[in-house]
């Protein structure tokens, strides 16, 4: 579309959600359903940021690609800042397999700390 001065109208801004969960943590949709829901909502880019796991990322990426949705690999880490728990988002993750292995150790340490508190 052009305006009266002959210039093209700007392209529509992409629709993006950079913080969402699947059943790999506390979400209600499987990674495949997450991708399908994003497409139905008209989102162009979504980040799957499950709590302390990247287990659903590969499934979401594979399901989203044919739907025209880009999945940004991510994770939401629960970390301690003194006595306060803070949620830290990691986005555009590379080396998912190495991160997944590190998160297993991370999750085990968190479980051990929780058991020690009880």
Language-model segment annotations:
Residues 13-15, 104-107:
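A general, composition-driven signal for non-globular sequence regions
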């Amino acid at each position: 579309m052009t305006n009266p001065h002959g210039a093209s109208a700007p392209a529509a801004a992409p629709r993006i959600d950079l913080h969402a969960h699947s059943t790999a943590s506390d979400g209600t949709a499987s990674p495949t359903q997450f991708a399908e829901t994003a497409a139905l909502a008209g989102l162009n880019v979504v980040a799957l940021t499950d709590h302390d796991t990247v287990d659903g990322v590969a499934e979401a990426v594979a399901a989203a690609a044919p739907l025209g949705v880009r999945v940004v690999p991510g994770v939401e880490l629960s970390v301690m800042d003194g006595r306060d728990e803070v949620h830290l988002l990691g986005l555009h993750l590379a080396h998912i397999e190495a991160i997944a292995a590190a998160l297993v150790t991370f999750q085990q340490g968190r479980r051990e700390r929780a058991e020690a508190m009880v």
